[in-house]
Amino acid sequence: MIAVIGEKPSVARDIARILGASEKQDGYLSGNGYLVTWAFGHLVGLAMPEAYGIQSFRRESLPIIPDSFQLTPRQVKAEKGYKADPGALKQLKVIKEVFDQSDKIIVATDAGREGELIFRYIYQYIGCNKPFVRLWISSLTDKSIREGLQNLKAGSLYDNLFLSAQARSEADYLIGINGTQALSVAAGQGIFSLGRVQSPTLAMICTRFLENKNFVPQKYWQLKLQTTKDNVTFTALSTEKYDMQQPAIDTLQRIKEAETVQVKTVERKEVNQEPPLLYDLTTLQKEANTKLNFSADKTLSIAQKLYEGKLISYPRTGSRYISQDVFEEIPERLVNLEQYTRFGGYAAGMKGKALNSRSVNDGKVTDHHALIVTENLPDKMEADEQAIYELIAGRMLEAFSEKCVKDVTSVTLECAGSLFTVKGSVIKSAGWRAVFGEKEDGEDNAALPAMQDGDSLPLSGIELLEKQTKPKPLHTESCLLSSMETAGKELENADLKASMKDTGIGTPATRAAIIETLFSRQYIVREKKNLVPTEKGLAVYNIIRDKKIADVEMTGMWENTLAKIESGEMNPDTFRKGIEVYARQITAELLDVQLSFVSGSGCICPKCKTGRILFYPKVAKCSNVDCSVTIFRNKSDKQLTDKQITELVTTGKTGLIKGFKSKNGKVFDASLAFDEQFNVTFVFPEKKGKPKK
């Protein structure tokens, strides 16, 4: 018997169908000599501190650094702490039984770092030692699965991939557990999540927000001249930008006395615009955020659905290139797109033409090639799925199309001793840009009239423009993904820049989840398309901004090391020792922090309706300094929780709270409510009357 394990039931069923394993069993399919089972994502993970006999959120327990990591079935929240997920336990039992009945295993989890980790953790946890081989494919079409099954890879080829995934998993555990617990212990109330990648990402958002908020615009002035040639009127801007208004006014007056404008230089050149590279996941997420206002997480979710629907290749890719053998299949894919309504005409026009090979490079294909559509055409799709599919299909058409050719004319004019410039652009051959027909910034200029050096033109107008400098815009998800992807540009060390360019902060597969974590922790919110830190997020940032845990350069070093483990250049034990030292350092830094923590409840003040309720260690009060709403946390010897205060603020009354203590020591139960002046008062439960006889 041969066992096969997929990452999800849907994928396992497709593989089982192709293998002829059609008999349904409890948790697996059988037939034709195969037993095909599945995981539900991460069934096994690293054990929580309590599994090692360590009490969490105790100063004396930190740092938490196990001698060796224990694996445990996936955990779910219970009334007290966590417990094993019953569904995970059941499926792990099935997997063990399937493996025990088999002579070897075909690993068909996702062909990537996390897919490898999912299988290896299960394999270790159930104590299996059967030999295994790897199904490594980039799409889930029947053709791709069949070819993959005929070309199974030795499992040992992916040992370094697993070691890198394991090292990343353990590093995230050590930094996340210790950072979160140390800051929470120092704060004295609440849970404040930190992470190896999460914290530098929060720092990037907060840094940009504060730069934008504290930016002081500077005024400057520029002159705009108007002239005419061959009945075509156009304008040009002065090359000089004036910091002071008076010199600009003086120049304006001088030019007003002139009658003509001299053509100083005319530069004409043909510009060839190469087509864009194919999408990797991050580039797709950026484009979908800009054009469709989709979050990174939403885009990944839709792409995963299209992948499982056999319509696109593996989405969690970090490459924008395809290999030569995949390139040979592209003409067939383009013929298929002739039947797709939106792109049919354009795809038909590419038939017989030489395809652009800019996106073809065997040396730049990583675990998976760039995103492309498969040979399967979609039947019915939801609107959001269609939008993402069309981005990928359209980009594929662009990538293999001809260059866009433009005529660009740059003219320098002189008037009364001042220089002005204007640029015109005309598309001669649209090439790849005909796919979507979109204009680029600065292409609204009509073609400039023909001019030569020395031409004299009439001055038909001059005006003074008052402008001001602008701050860097707030981060959108699109520009944050760019910052995460190319954070190395902010570094001074050349070697680190190179490593960060390749690996960045996080990975293509994890960046969306990191951003979503910041939302779920209430560290950031969306304001239109912008990502804005909350009071809680800013408070955390103010604590960690000069600490190692928020250091982009340090994160880059770890990413570089993880990449070296994957390539076999670095021993994972060396990495582990370094991470342990790092965990001890950040724990010590955070435990030494002296702070009075303020976090935002997100609740509008019920009295003034303009401020927001802020949580402090001893009180909660309105952010509006002119408002008097204050709620003391300690009420009659009972410490109020954030949840109880939030309920009071939002509804005007809490549920029944047990355990208040009067001045004479008597324990009583009551609700809390606001009176007409928004003071907090007790509301006692109605006493049940004695039944009538």
PLM regions and their residue ranges:
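Conserved short loop/turn motifs at secondary-structure junctions
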Residues: M1-A3, D110-A111, G188-S193, R268-L277, ...
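Amphipathic alpha-helical transducer elements in NTP-driven molecular machines
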Residues: P9-A16, G33-V36, F40, R59-L62, ...
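Metal- or metallocofactor-binding catalytic centers and their adjacent structured scaffolds
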Residues: D243-Y279, Q285
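C-terminal or mid-to-C-terminal helical accessory/interaction module adjacent to the motor/catalytic core
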Residues: G87, K93, D100-Q101, L140-T227, ...
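Short strand-coil-strand connectors
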Residues: S30-N32, Q226-D230, E414-S418, N664
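Basic, low-complexity terminal or inter-domain segments flanking catalytic cores
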Residues: I2, G81, Y125, T180, ...
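Intrinsically disordered, low-complexity regulatory segments
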Residues: M1-S169, G179, P471
